[in-house]
Swiss-Prot record:
It holds the Pfam family Trypan_glycop_C. InterPro entries: Trypano_VSG_A_N_dom, Variant_surf_glycoprt_trypan_C. GO terms for cellular component: plasma membrane; side of membrane. Keywords: Cell membrane, Disulfide bond, Glycoprotein, GPI-anchor, Lipoprotein, Membrane, Signal, Trypanosomiasis. It is found in: Cell membrane. It is a lipid-anchor; GPI-anchor. The keyword Ribonucleoprotein does not apply. Residues 481-503 form a propeptide. This is Variant surface glycoprotein ILTAT 1.3. Residues 1-29 form the signal peptide. Disulfide bonds join C42-C168, C150-C206. The lineage of its organism: Eukaryota, Discoba, Euglenozoa, Kinetoplastea, Metakinetoplastina.
Length: 503
């Protein structure tokens, strides 16, 4: 081996060592940032913008679900009030809507402080990254052949196109899309090469990464960008930063994202369904056993069956309640279509609308009208029933006094008075309400003082004697007057309607 050959081999080794040192070591002032590092930063930034848009999309969907379920509940509440015969069906559908609404609130509740703050932190980090990259991208010569850049080709520092909007996402976040990647993976993959951030090749012209100690007379400490993701030595430019494996849990702009991102991904998932609000949607829900199965839990809640009382065939029960015929037409849906009301609009004006035309605000206004109407009817019917019962009690007490024979026997009763001028011997002894009141005897007490109840009084009467207002002949027997019974039934209907409003 000649001396010249040995010298040549030594020179090659020194050149190789110099190349390796240039490739693997930082330490050249003005060296540009690697294109791959800038691209990795941008991939995270774009995903963060998409994550924010996904949050907006998710919350909008949850809001729409809550509104639709609320509308469905109001629709069926109005049916329960307006059509008492359809009340159970209406309450089942109303309960179904309530269940879906509760699920929607649960979806909303997933966005607790950790989740929402993580999205906020991701957007903040995106802004920091965008600002840093945008400044570097702007620091380049307009003559690409000069290879004067702050973002350059990794291997040789030459000019390489950098499409900021395509890589980092548009400046207007809303236009970035809404299918975020995994930010937990992005912070590992996007920042993987940040530690060795400087491009090699000797095209060192980025004034941002200049010898700061010389440029500013005195700069004794390194400068951190992005809370330490990028580190610039005070004299030798871009230098090695702490590895992302450590920074992801310590770097202030990343650590909360890495820790909480799994919670965010879970919060993106929604479970709530939407209750029907249109005629066709109700028909679709009731059309077959598979779809009607969704109503079984609501039917159980409304009826509160004990295990022994639960219908053997739940679908048969539902078909009966919703009055579904052989052609899968539901009389309940038909009843909904037939409901129309004068809905308050503004300044004392009203507008007639059908149920399926009503908005949520219309339904609320219609229910307010019904509540006032029911309250008025309830008060009126309660008064009428009390008065009817009082009148019947007086009549029964009058009959009790009429049956008393002789002045002494009559006057001895604390609620009777003998009238000697009465020509009818059967009516000389009469009920005296004033005497009864002074004696502390109520009509009810007087009525039980030897007379029959209204029911007993009618029960034994012959057909010719069975007359209103107290009695009515039905079939072969004399029964209580249907008038008061009808009033009592009407009162029970109103009470049931009120109960439906509270369900």
């Amino acid at each position: 081996m000649t001396k010249a050959y040995e010298n040549r081999m030594l020179l090659q080794a020194l050149v190789l060592a110099a190349v390796l040192c240039t490739t693997h070591a930082e330490g050249t002032a003005k060296a540009p940032l690697k294109h791959s590092v800038a691209t990795g930063f941008c991939s995270f930034s774009k995903a963060a913008k998409q994550a924010a848009n996904k949050l907006a999309q998710t919350l909008d969907a949850v809001k729409a679900t809550l509104n639709q379920n609320r509308k469905a509940h109001l629709q069926n509440l109005l049916v329960a009030v307006k059509r008492p015969t359809e009340q159970i069906a209406a309450l089942i559908l109303g309960q179904y809507a309530n269940t879906q609404a509760a699920s929607g609130l649960s979806d909303l509740g997933k966005w607790a402080p950790d989740e929402t703050k993580t999205i906020g932190q991701a957007l903040y980090t995106s802004g920091r990254l965008d600002g840093f990259i945008d400044v570097l991208d702007g620091h380049r010569s307009e003559n690409s052949g000069q290879n004067k850049n702050c973002i350059a080709n990794d291997g040789d520092g030459t000019t390489k196109a950098f499409d900021f909007d395509a890589l980092c996402g548009p400046t207007e976040v809303a236009k970035a899309g809404n299918e975020p990647g995994d930010l937990k993976s992005s912070d590992r993959n996007g920042f993987w090469w940040h530690r060795r951030a400087a491009a090699s090749g000797g095209n060192n012209h980025c004034v941002i990464f200049d010898d700061l100690n010389t440029a500013y007379s005195t700069k004794t400490a390194a400068t951190d960008f992005l809370a330490g993701l990028i580190k610039v030595h005070q004299t030798t430019g871009l230098t090695a930063a702490t590895a992302i494996a450590a920074q992801k849990s310590t770097n202030k702009i990343l650590k909360d994202i890495d820790a909480n991102w799994p919670k965010v991904q879970q919060a993106y998932t929604t479970a709530a369904g939407r209750s029907p609000t249109t005629e066709q949607e109700y028909k679709d829900l009731l059309k077959d056993e598979s779809s009607r199965q969704k109503l079984r839990a609501a039917a159980q809640t409304v009826n509160n069956w004990k295990p022994a009382d639960k219908p053997a065939n739940m679908d048969d029960y539902l078909k009966q309640v919703f009055k579904i015929d052989a052609n899968v037409n539901s009389a309940y849906v038909t009843a909904m279509k037939e409901i129309s009301m004068d809905v308050p609009t503004k300044d004392g004006e009203t507008q007639k609308k059908e149920l399926f035309e009503m908005s949520e605000e219309d339904l609320e206004a219609a229910l307010a009208v019904e509540i006032r109407r029911l309250s008025s009817e309830n008060a009126k019917l309660t008064t009428e029933v009390k008065q009817l019962r009082r009148n019947q009690g007086k009549q029964a007490t009058e009959d009790t006094c009429n049956k008393m024979k002789g002045e002494t026997a009559c006057n001895n009763k604390p609620f009777c008075t003998y009238n000697a001028t009465e020509t009818d011997e059967n009516k000389k002894c009469k009920f005296n309400e004033t005497k009864a009141s002074k004696s502390g005897v109520s009509v009810a007490q007087a009525q039980t003082g030897g007379t029959q109840t209204t029911t007993d009084k009618c029960k034994d009467k012959k057909k010719d004697d069975c007359k209103s207002p107290d009695c009515k002949w039905e079939g072969e027997t004399c029964k209580d007057s249907s008038f008061i019974l009808n009033k009592q039934f009407a009162l029970s209907v109103v009470s049931a309607a009120f109960a439906a409003l509270l369900f």
